[in-house]
Amino acid sequence: MNGDCANMNFRPIIAIIFFISSVSLSFNSHAYQEIEVADGATIQGKAVLTGKMPYPRIYHLILFPNIDMCAEVDTDDEMNRVLDDFKISKDGGLKDVVITLNHVEAGKPFNKKPIIIDSEDCKFFPEVNAVRQFESFKVNNLDAVMHNSQVYQKERGKIIQNLPIPPESITNGKVTFQKNFKIFQMICGMHEFMQTWGYRIQNPYYFITKLDGEFKIDNIPPGEYDLNAWHYLMKTQSQRIKVAKNGTTNINFKFNGDKVIRPLYETIKSGRIKKDAAYPGTAKGRELGK
């Protein structure tokens, strides 16, 4: 009788141990493994914007605190902060497109630099980051005023972190996505036009385009993968590719300026989008990539 009771008591414990072990093995089997890559391949190309330049977003500074300091950059004659979401080169190269290679289970080491987001003149730099799950980051406030950083999971989604940033100080944060979420947006709760974006990466095979729109990802294990291109106001593009040993594959991505994805609260009727506002240093409404 006592032996039967003992066996019955142990069965739930054994089941729990088995479950935990199974979850651990499942997690580890999907974790990226750093290995030495032999005969690695290269993917290179360019992201461009075609069609007409999308209208910029504007924020009336009179509605926000610290107007004198915030008007130091990216402000028009009507005291509107103008957000330059589409930075382009003369030939249409598009900046801040995150290129990622999916389904790489093992390959080169990350060697990723820590994320440091600067806040100066009521503006976050850089405007786009590549982020890993549970990665720490720092917000360096160079302004003499306080900012309140709110981190959203996806665009205007659930707030996953609230970071008060005292004047001229550094605040620490940490990225924690729920399952299947890839995008975070950080906005200052006091100055809504202060925005920066992050895109979740699973491996070190990624690239954030500069002003020329060009990208290059190297040392890739030969195989078949999905190559994605993401811009925070455009639909993600994807191409299935196969790379060979020591080979170079050329891939380009074209984003149509007429197909910007904006939330409903950012429309011309709401006053957030202004047709006659000019991007800093660019010609508005001109044809691109032709």
Task: Write out the residue ranges for each language-model feature.
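Bacterial N-terminal signal peptides that target proteins for export
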Residues: 5-15
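Intrinsic-disorder/low-complexity peptide segments enriched for small residues
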Residues: 6-8, 23, 81
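Bacterial N-terminal signal peptides
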Residues: 14-24
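N-terminal signal peptide c-region/cleavage motif recognized by signal peptidases
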Residues: 26-28
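Extracytoplasmic copper-binding redox domains, predominantly the cupredoxin/blue-copper superfamily
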Residues: 31-290
